[in-house]
A protein has these predicted regions:
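Bilobed "Venus flytrap"/periplasmic-binding protein-like clamshell domains
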Residues: 23-48, 58, 76-77, 105-172, ...
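Short, hydrophobic alpha-helical packing/hinge segments within bilobed ligand-binding/sensory domains
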Residues: 60-65, 78-79, 171-175, 181
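Hydrophobic, well-ordered secondary-structure segments
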Residues: 144-147, 151-156, 165-177, 202-204, ...
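Acidic, polar ligand-binding/catalytic clefts
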Residues: 65-125
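A ligand-binding cleft/hinge motif common to bilobed small-molecule-binding domains
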Residues: 73-87, 152, 177, 182-202
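An extracytoplasmic/periplasmic, membrane-proximal ligand-sensing/linker region
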Residues: 9, 21-28, 32-40, 228-283
Length: 283
């Protein structure tokens, strides 16, 4: 009985001396179809670092501003906006290299313009006056890049007929697939993952044009994470590509590996954002 009490006391003492380790909180601010892949990635990084890790769905940029999230999977457009608002609040860690021959082993992706396979459209120019689905205004591949493309053609959004905002790439894909809209531009990674999960999709949709390449959405650390921990997270993410089991996990998200990335890589998005914003009439 005395021994039992001593063991319990030791456990209590150990708990007091070694308080529970704070979990490493990852958040997915990208398409929900990437959540299973990124949840597994987060768990593997946690195991590599010897800390508990969890993935949550990102619900608002305040999570990045206040540091309630440690690491985030984030689109390049909100990234450049947020660091423009407060330099240093986010640190680029890595970006995925996709298993897509068009990407040429670089951290880039495309905005694929999709239509139904049985539609008559063969090029972006043939979509004049047709119904179009944007993702949402904060999406680079699903909105801003299309607006930039229209400007390069000397056009405005009046080029399209009816415009809708779907709120996510998967919904844009669904609406094109069902014929609710004629066309949309979607993240090439999301489209690739949807094709992996639903092979019938490839027979129902066609890509008539690809905008890009553009620097791909990235993984960032918030200011809540110490510099040494940021470096360890970056290294753990990069090492996933050298482990056969982890490579299978990455493949479910069409990812070949993660590679280090820096802020300058997103200058292409900054430039396109500046062009689009300068074209918006003031007042």
């Amino acid at each position: 009985m005395t021994v039992g009490r001593a063991i319990n006391c030791a456990k209590l003492c150990n708990t007091a001396v070694n308080p529970p380790v704070k979990p490493l909180v990852f958040a997915n601010f990208l398409a929900p179809d990437m959540t299973p892949t990124y949840a597994d990635v987060a768990a593997r990084v946690g195991r590599a670092l010897g800390v508990p890790a969890q993935l949550i769905e990102g619900s608002g940029w305040e999570q990045l501003r206040d540091g309630s999230v440690d690491v985030a999977f984030l689109c390049g457009l909100p990234y450049v906006r947020l660091v423009g608002e407060r330099p240093g609040m986010l640190r680029p860690l890595v970006a995925p290299v996709l298993d897509d021959a068009r990407c040429r082993d670089q951290p880039v992706y495309f905005s694929d313009v999709i239509v139904r396979r049985d539609s008559p459209f063969r090029s972006f120019g043939e979509l004049r006056g047709r119904s179009w689905a944007y993702n949402e205004p904060g999406s680079f591949s699903g909105c801003l890049l299309v607006r930039h493309h229209l400007l390069q053609l000397g056009e405005t959004e009046a080029f399209f007929g009816r415009l809708t905002f779907t709120g996510r790439h998967q919904e844009s894909i669904r609406q094109v697939r069902t014929g609710e809209v004629d066309a949309s531009a979607v993240d090439s990674q999301v489209l690739g993952v949807e094709r992996l999960r639903d092979p019938a999709l490839a027979g129902e949709l066609r890509v008539i044009e690809s905008l890009g390449p553009s620097t791909i959405p990235l993984v960032v650390a918030t200011a809540a994470v110490r510099n040494d921990a940021q470096l360890r997270v970056r290294a753990a993410l990069c090492e996933l590509g050298s482990d056969p089991v982890s490579r299978n996990v990455l493949a479910s998200g069409l990812i070949r590996r993660f590679t280090p990335i820096d802020d300058r890589a997103y200058d292409d998005i900054r430039q396109k954002l500046a062009i689009v914003e300068s074209a918006v009439p003031s007042g």
